[in-house]
Amino acid sequence: MPDRLVPATLAFRDDGTLVSPAYGDIYHSAAGAIAQANHVFVAGNGLPARWQQRRTFTIVETGFGTGCNFLATWAAWRDDPARCERLHFVSVEKHPFSREDLRRAAAHIVANTTISASVDALADAWPPLVPGLHRLEFDAGRVVLTLVFGDALERLPTLVARADAFYLDGFAPSKNADLWSIDVFRALARMADEHATFATYSSSGVVKRALDEAGFAYRKVDGFAGKRAMLVGEYAPRWRMRRHEPPRAWPNAAARRALVIGAGVAGCAVVERLAARGWNVTLIERHERIASEASGNPAGVFHPLMTRDDNVASRLTRAGFLYALARWRALEAGGHAFARSTHGMVHLAESADDFARMRDAFDALGAPSDYARLLDTDAARAYLNLPVAHGGLLFPHGGAVWPAALADAQCAAAGDRVQRLTRTEVARLERNGDEWHALDAHGRTLAQAPVVVLANAGDAVRLAGLRHVALQPVRGQLTLLPAASASPPPCPAIGDGYAVPLDDGTLLIGATFEPDDVDPAIRVAGHAENLERVRRLLPGLIGDVPALDTLRGRVAFRWVAGDRLPLIGPLADEAQAVANARALSGAKARDLPRMPGLYGAFGYGSRGLVWAALGAELIASQLDGEPWPIERELAEAVDPARFLIRALRARQVSAAD
């Protein structure tokens, strides 16, 4: 079952101080929230001096609240000419405010200050109140806020980050004991960089004992606004306390050069995310144009999954869906707009039992209306202005996207940092010193770089020489109906099949799902199958249709893994793992040897639009040693090495293989 979020209640004391009715405590001192944030957390962690001349600086906070600590830190960073290149701020919040309550609370706190504009930017970017990680970017991506909605006790151990500073904030230990427990401090210690600092308003004995036990050295300093003392200090364990160190930047990341092989939505998303961090990327595509294979379809549908148990696929599609929306809005704001629908998308149930499952999933998540709405049969009929057999889910921000236009926009955003090599086929990869060489069929070097990201779908397995990854091709044929043959719905609708209205009045319907069929020819039987599906889904949508052999269509191939999850991240050194199979029989993902600088972003199946941006951000974060945009469990669920790990654990691999 998902952890339903309970939003914070906006309430004030008579003196104007913001208070939490649930905890019976104030959010900040009556002497001023921003002044308190600057004294306790910014200065308490030796900032801004400690981030100066750094490429990246990461702060982890235990309670976001009104965001005043983030706003104060952002202002200090902006005012510092020697600031770090990228500031990461990771903050956990069990009871986030709604967007409008956050705007009111933060505006009240920063009234009559220069931070007011930042409040609007924060509120405008505020995500729907659903569990998980939400990555927001400000100041052209140089300030990155990762909000972690959920209980700190449960969420902190799932985070992957190397923290330079900790803001230990939250209601008093007597009011919220869980947030100050030893388990929380141990989770923070696992993320601490050497000599990472911390600061906290509290100086209670409970906090001091937990700090000491987790390996933090503390000292008392003057508190804020007459408070006698607060605590500051650093991570200084007396002995080694962790099996795995928090992640660092990849050793050769300083070169900031990469090859991306495959120019569909997966590869172009990687290009954009690396270029945004200052990487120079060579994009290699075997076709004349980018987005020529599955990404060349006229449109693709875009929506999350919802399940009652909120399983890995649901959480991953939710994270990908929301992150993609944030990235696409940033592209549009930067002048790189592309074609996408804006009236939501309806996922119709296929039966009464299917609708009951949708209702259970919706109720379990407690989804807010800006994320999903449950429509009964009458409501779905009214929304689509068409007869329907069952209700479904409305995703207000779901819809359809033209993948090729998105890929173009991502490459345009990368600007001069991307060099395109089209009509270029990579026959094999070869490691020479610290660089990978992409070679043609004659052994000539096409391009070289320390990092390669394989985003070329089914061919990635061959190029990487992976023996423990099996991808299956799935043929998908779509059909284009002329405007006279249908009355297009106001938004895309999906179920067992889909119907997407295009701008020219054409109706896109599809698609067939034919595993292990690699026939590229359009078939009349495929058109007939698509028509039958959509007629069941939306009776009355389709009228008279021309002869099937005259209909236009397109065939593309989706590549899927056995568990239907993508493969994203560093590729395993399978030869070394096999040679050490016995020692690695109980291995975790972090124990496995990896191919230096070789990453994958493939196997997206029919969910490339949902997963591509998130996958690209994960790879870029891994390369640069930044906080990951998803929890470790989700990253391990998409790790390309997961099948090898399972084989090792089952002792199905030996050095003789």
Curated annotation (Swiss-Prot):
First and last residue of the signal peptide: none
EC number from the UniProt entry: 2.1.1.61, 1.5.-.-
Cofactor(s) the record lists: FAD
InterPro entries: FAD-dep_OxRdtase (IPR006076), FAD/NAD-bd_sf (IPR036188), MnmC-like_methylTransf (IPR008471), SAM-dependent_MTases_sf (IPR029063), tRNA_MAMT_biosynth_bifunc_MnmC (IPR023032), tRNA_MNMC2 (IPR047785), tRNA_S-uridine_synth_MnmC_C (IPR017610)
Catalytic activity: 5-aminomethyl-2-thiouridine(34) in tRNA + S-adenosyl-L-methionine = 5-methylaminomethyl-2-thiouridine(34) in tRNA + S-adenosyl-L-homocysteine + H(+)
Subcellular location: Cytoplasm
Protein name per Swiss-Prot or TrEMBL: tRNA 5-methylaminomethyl-2-thiouridine biosynthesis bifunctional protein MnmC
Species, as recorded: Burkholderia multivorans (strain ATCC 17616 / 249)
Lineage: Bacteria, Pseudomonadati, Pseudomonadota, Betaproteobacteria, Burkholderiales
